[in-house]
Amino acid sequence: MTERIALFPGSFDPFTKGHLDTVERASRLFDRVIIAVMTNAAKKPLFDGPTKVALIETVIADLDNVSVVAQPKTLTANFAQAVGARYLIRGIRNANDFEYERDIAALNQTQDAQLETVLLLAKQEFSFISSSMVKEIAAFGGQVDQLVPPAVAVALQEKLKHGRD
């Protein structure tokens, strides 16, 4: 039987509890899940790629079939082919996410017709969390403990504290 490999691409800036829930659920559906920290040219990241990879590795340490890689400046479909992934994992929080992901899935199909996008609906308790909002809350000194894993919360506090100095 062919190994079912899924790719979970994203900028993960920062990695949230919603991302973690999506990865945990995907890890039960697939033989292997690769989290790909991608470069989004439209976003200005708070954390660099190696820092994001290190944080995510800490958070997912107990998930034996999940790994993390930094893959800057490449098309997701091309990277999926390079690592043998036939599935893309995407978390959906709302109708806007669905519309966006449907269009991206169609574009990915133009690059690789065999690449399937699997949409996982966010659990209610994570449906309002976005990395952008987490950064904004943290930047103004708000509490992010309920929104991100503990290691990420600490890294956010440290990064923003040093960024203000």
Curated annotation (Swiss-Prot):
Q: Which InterPro entries does the entry mention?
A: Cyt_trans-like, PPAT, Rossmann-like_a/b/a_fold
Provide the binding site for ATP: 11-12, 19, 91-93, 101, 126-132
Named cofactor requirement(s): Mg(2+)
The annotated site for Transition state stabilizer falls at 19
Q: Which terms does the UniProt entry file under GO BP?
A: coenzyme A biosynthetic process
The pathway this protein participates in, as annotated, is: Cofactor biosynthesis; coenzyme A biosynthesis; CoA from (R)-pantothenate: step 4/5
Q: What does this protein do?
A: Reversibly transfers an adenylyl group from ATP to 4'-phosphopantetheine, yielding dephospho-CoA (dPCoA) and pyrophosphate.
Question: What is the recorded name of this protein?
Answer: Phosphopantetheine adenylyltransferase
Name the lineage. Answer: Bacteria, Bacillati, Bacillota, Bacilli, Lactobacillales
